[in-house]
Amino acid sequence: MSIVQTPAKRMTGGELGLILVFAALGFFSIVVAAKAYTPEYAFHAYLFAAASIATVFVIGNRYMDRPAELPPQTIDGKPNYNMAPVKVGTLLAVFWGIAGFLIGVIIALQMAYPLFNFDLPWISFGRLRPLHTSAVIFAFGGNVLIATSFYVVQRTSHARLAGYLAPWFVVLGYNFFIVIAGTGYLLGITQGKEYAEPEWYADLWLTIVWVTYFLVFLGTVLKRKEPHIYVANWFYLAFILTIAVLHLGNNAAIPVSVFSPKSYIVWSGVQDAMVQWWYGHNAVGFFLTAGFLALMYYFIPKRADKPVYSYRLSIVHFWALIFLYIWAGPHHLHYTALPDWAQTLGMTFSIMLWMPSWGGMINGLMTLSGAWDKLRTDPIIRMMVVAVAFYGMATFEGPMMSVKSVNSLSHYTEWGIGHVHSGALGWVAYISFGAIYCLIPWLWNKREMYSMKAIEWHFWVSTLGIVLYICAMWVAGILQGLMWRAYTALGFLEYSFIETVEAMHPLYVIRAIGGILFLAGSLIMAWNVFMTITRAETVSQPSGAALAPAE
């Protein structure tokens, strides 16, 4: 009689290392909380301590429950994909999306009806506005990018995600950063830098998470079984790497003390403004553009069951975008103390960006060649194609607004808000919704979303909301700009500032209505996601196959 010996279970170096690191972090956080200069900072230190202690217990419990052998890279010769972090990231994206849209509706109502501030500092416009932008960009958008990148890189590489605990650290660590940043805004902890409000300790935590994200993604690409690196992975890598550089450069700061939330940025004056908008514009360029173009290059061909229209054009699109986008930041600082040559440089590169941007748009739209009927029959395809159309519109409007003569009218007005939201709602949100509608059935092995009719409703309700929103802001912005520059025959300003504010009121109300409709659409999506996971018909095999590279 033969005896089969099972290998002895041993804790991996990663498990042991993380337990020790988080135990030390928990102890250090308790010390910081006890000596913190402010109660708000002490609250954050206690959050770090609680999260660290919980992580130690979770890793220990996971070790006790797992078999001696770590999950294999392949099963019966097929890749053993690690989709659990992708599932969590996708659901968190839905949650944060609704939260961010809800906060946006609240601050839109505050703009139209200031009584909605309720004289409470924690929910005043000044604190909710950065909470809204961070929730929709970094919480919703960031989770979409992390989840889809982990899915796409595995499928196109035919390889399991690199690392055992590292993918979980990326997903959960990133969302812990969102919690720290968001609660910090409500408590008044901020650097005062747009899109980079979190203070030094949150930035430091995000740096650790982001480096891990880069290593997991790159490690998966390096161990790929496919000789070809699919173009979507190029865009993901550019987004991850460039955001890391931008984050480090713009958040270079010296803390007052380890016991204080306050820090001082190493840049000052006009140099600080330039670095801020080098970061701010390229957060748009690489977080909200390059990252989501990766979604376009994977999910539209997958859903349409067609290859990318021109793979060569996608490579040209990639390199042109990467080279040009990084120079366009100064167009945010027209008519300021920034040297005129730098303003002109930013304007020039912004105009040049129009061509590669539209090259990508054409590539995305023409991928549907031979499958245009799906625009009528498939609301998910329709949503993603409309997203690409909004991308084209926003990338024409942006270069146009960067021209100094146009910018003299549009700068500091609601036109800029309309432009941002045509890209954020029309491009980023719609391509994200399309990706989520694709991912949910694939991840949970469902035949299709629970209700295609609900997706139709989501599309039309949200589209009406977007149209109301951006049209109201376009009209408001142009009206604002014209009223500000209107003079009487004697050379006096024709309108007082309060008159320009009063003229905005009906347009602010329309914006709030548009936001409510967009939020309603996202709630329909959340219901559909829940019903798909719990009620929809299950299939025996996962329906999302790897995407073969197009030629």
Curated annotation (Swiss-Prot):
Membrane-topology annotation of the record: Multi-pass membrane protein
A Gene Ontology biological process term: respiratory electron transport chain
Co-factor(s): Cu(2+); heme b
Reactions accelerated catalytically: 4 Fe(II)-[cytochrome c] + O2 + 8 H(+)(in) = 4 Fe(III)-[cytochrome c] + 2 H2O + 4 H(+)(out)
SUPFAM superfamilies: Cytochrome c oxidase subunit I-like
Record CDD domains: cbb3_Oxidase_I
Matching NCBIfam families: ccoN (TIGR00780)
The protein's name: Cytochrome c oxidase subunit 1 homolog
Source lineage: Bacteria, Pseudomonadati, Pseudomonadota, Alphaproteobacteria, Hyphomicrobiales
